[in-house]
Structures are given as C-alpha cells and as structure tokens.
C-alpha cells in the first residue's frame, strides 16, 4: 500500500516538473523566436536609438506665398559611456572648438546621462557635416542627427511669426513630449500654434559595429516609427501689404495693424522698429538676441499687442456712441466750443460753433466731446457718477476696450479702462465726477489701448456693431480646416442707427472741406477715418489714425500709430491711406506722399 502511494506521488512530481519544464521551453521559444523585444535589450550595446525629429509645418500668407519653411541642419550627438580612444584634437579641429570646450561639452553630456544621447554640438552646417561624416567612424560614441531650422524667405513679420528656441528644464518637466535639446515656439504664432506645428517624433533603431559604423537598421526597421511632419498654417496675412507696411515704417517707432472686418483675419501686423526674423535662427540666435534685447529702440517689443497707448481723438467716436445710446445727445445736439464752451478743455481747431456730432468728428473738436462726456456723467436716470461711469465703461468694453480680444497671438495686453473702484481709491468714494476724469472724453488720462484694440474698434464700426476676434491663422493643416474664430461673433451694445451717425462723421474726415484727413482721400473710394494726436508722458505727441474702406462693403480696417511724431494727420493718416490703396488696388499712384513717408526718419524725434 505504501509503495503504491509512493509510486503515485512520484508520478505526480515527475509530471509537475515535466509540465513546468514544458512551460519554460514554450516561454523560451516565444522570447527567442517570436518576441524580439528581448533581443533588443540583449543587443543594446550595439544598437543606437535615433530620434527622428519631424519638420515643423510651413506657414503661408493668404495668397499662398511661403512665409516660413525649414532648412536642414545637423546635431552632433554623443553617448558618453561609449566614447573610447577618441582623437580629441581632431574632433576639436573639425568643429572649430578648443580642448576646454570639448571637455565642457562632455561634462554637460555626462551630467545629463552617461547612457543616453545628448547634443554635443548643435546646428552643424551642411559643409561641416560633410567633413565629419567622412571621419565619424573614428569617433566612437558620436553620431549625427538631422534637424531642421526655420527660414524666412521674405524677412518680414518677425513679431507676427515669432521664433523657436530650446525647451527649458521647466517645460521638459511639464511635458511627456519634450526632451532636453528639443525646440519649441517661443513667441508669435510659432508659440500659439506649437502643437499644430511641431508634428510627431519618430524613432529609428540602428545597428553599429565596433568601429562606430552604421551597419543598417535593426530587424529591417520592424521597430522603427516614422516622424510625422507638423501641420501647415494658412494665415490671413497679405505678404505684399506686410512688406509695404514695414517699408513705410522704417526708421519710425510704432505699429500698423490691418484687419478684414468681414472675418477678423489680420491682413498686416507689424511693430516698428522690427528685425529680420532670420537673425533669431541657428547658432547666431543667442548673440543676436542679446544685441536686439539691449537696443534702446526696443526692436523685440511687440508694440501691436503690448504697446499700450493713449488713443487720443480716435477714442472720441466711442464716447459719442455711448452718449447717443444712453440718449443724452442726439444727432442734432449742438455744443459750443467758444467762450465758456472752451473750458476746461480748449479747442485746437478753427471752425464754426456751435457744432453737431458730424462736424465734431470731422474737425476733432475737443470741447464737444468733453460736453458729451459730461452729459453722460450727469444722466438723471442714474443715482450717482459711479453708476453712470460703470454704464459708460460697460458699453466701451462691448466695443473691445479694456479687455483682451482673445487673438491667437501670445502676450496680448488688455490696455486700461479702469473700473470705478480705481477712482474711488484715488479720490475717495463719492468725491469724483466728470470734471475729475474729463481727460477720458478725448482719449487721454487713464485710458490706454493697444493698436490691435484700435483696429478692432474700427472694424466694429465698419461692421455696424459687431466684430470677430482678430486672428492671424485662418486654417490649419489644409485650407479647408478653418479655425473657429468665425463662430465667435462679438456684438457691441450700440444700436446701428447711432453707429451710422458716427460713420458719416468719419466720412467727413476725408470728404469734408475741413476734414483732418482730406488731403489723403483716395479718388473713387469711399473712406471713413479719424485722426488722433495723443500726448504722452514724455510731453511729445503720438500720431494716431484709424480708418476703413470702402464704407459700404468694408474690406480693410486699419490702425497706424507713429510714436512721438506729432499730429495724426501728419504721419499716421497718410501711411494708413497708402496702405489702404496698396491693399485694394495692389499699387500706389501717389508717389510723392509715398516717398515722403518712406524716407522720413523719426527715430530721433
């Protein structure tokens, strides 16, 4: 009986071992024959994992002109642990670096990781790459990795397009996508559309022999993944108009922004002084950035969305529209600008008095607009100045003042349209009134606007009461894949009938016998505009102008600001008029005006 039990146990034990052994054999077969990932691990010492960086998407203007493309460069990569018996003198000679530079780079690579590849020398030219490639087999642990850099064929739109640079450690820590040495959009639409532009990385596994020679792909590329190029961007920018605007603004400080009112697409976006965007590309970027950053005329400052200026007289129509909407004035209301009517804000133009809103806009009469503001701040339908001011401010914010417009450009500022609490804090609750803040009525004092806000305001008027967020990119990936800005209609709280009154006044700026921009009317084109002369903290005046055309079916709205250049009619108005002519007619006939604007140097004003 005992022997039988023993025999049964022996059978069970043997069977168990046989089953376990069979399982191990099956697993071993799977590992060695079917699942090659273990082979990858076993052969890690002779395999090289090379990231395939995708080309960033291209950027086009509204007519298909190429604004940004890619150019091939090469990074010399190093895996410190694999570096053996390297002729440092030879590699230093090929790269044009010192022995000290070699050791600094190697230390940085070891600190990053002895086992992983990192950039030893970045952005090697094609010529240098050719020399190195021939001798690369002599430098164990080194290999070349292709990259691309941005190129700007027309050398325009630096603030609009932006630039790319290396990711920071903070950005690496926050992302699963970026690794040390990767590039990322830093400003402009390169930053705003980074995810769309960057593409998807790929990976190639290459076999390398003991002489550091690439002997082919592992498993015929079975485990490789291809990089996917980033999506192209199709912008609303008119490259010819942009180039022309930059020519007009040469040797001047300021900004031009133009919009298609029907869509909100930005046609021209420039900040002056600007710079050639190619300066911030490649190995010279760091040096050039330092030069630009230290330049006293601030070429890196994006004045179009970060410059906050007093709007001056361009703001007067906004005040008029609020007065009309609140019912404190009508189109027939007249105010005098002589005698007591010229106090506390004097008139700076010679014209008939009293005058109505049409004449006041045409001739930019300060006292008229101050008295409109005083009427608003005395409206008997509200209990106090604070309530009246809050209503006034709410109307203005519906026009796009005092808030961000949610454009597709980074670092947009909102200007300044202070809430009533600010004046409570400055003057005391209940201790301020229209007289206290009278400068607001003519676009001075605390009110500040960006050029983007002013052109958006002109666009809102052109559309008779609404606007779409100003934006640069109209579609991503292909021209049919539109951005969603066209679904974001913003409606101002002003009735169309009151906007039409203001538009008629703006037409008279060009067409009236005393219009402040009558000298810059384009024949056979209906135009509406407003000059602005805004005093700055330096005591000098900025030259401001907003306009749109044609009045009946607006195709362009524009804002021009020329810093410390004097009257709006002297510089900003003619520049805006030339830009409108260029866009609508594709040529400019008024050569004398054009030459005067192009040749003027106002940087030393």
Which role does the model predict for each range below?
Residues 1-286, 308, 331, 388-398, ...:
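Periplasmic/cell-envelope proteins involved in peptidoglycan metabolism and beta-lactam response
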